[in-house]
């Protein structure tokens, strides 16, 4: 009886701790817990609900986590395949830059994901101005890059977008970072 009371007390204490339900549910999606997302959506939650830390939707988390079945479920429930996170990334950007499968990228594209969406990060965040193809190329995701090309995907440079590169950040007086380094600067 004493152990039962202790166990009940522990569960009551845990229940009093305030967890950010959105973050824990988004993490469950990333980890592939399809039961958690089904339960959350059944409770009336918005399919495109964003977490507060990364400002990503369930579709972002499922895509980044390589969770194909959850991606399918979310799309069936009306998830916006072109929703952006706090960095301006779509789920397709994340599919190209993480361990997501080619099948996830194909599914997103087949449901209308913009293959040339630009991520434009807010000031103070990482460098923006990349397409899903740029992300796939940087992530050495050759199969996804080929898929994006097949569907008309282009790099930001090919689209004529003046985006920041590491070299452009390092330029000083028209010189590249390598030129400045060679001069001792």
Spell out what each predicted region is.
Residues 27-32, 61-67, 94-101, 126-130, ...:
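Ankyrin repeat A-helix N-terminal signature
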Residues 51-52, 85, 119-121, 126, ...:
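Ankyrin repeat boundary/linker residues
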Residues 33-41, 67-75, 100-109, 141-149, ...:
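Ankyrin repeat structural motif
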Residues 17-19:
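Bacterial signal peptide processing site
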Residues 4-13:
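Sec-dependent N-terminal signal peptides
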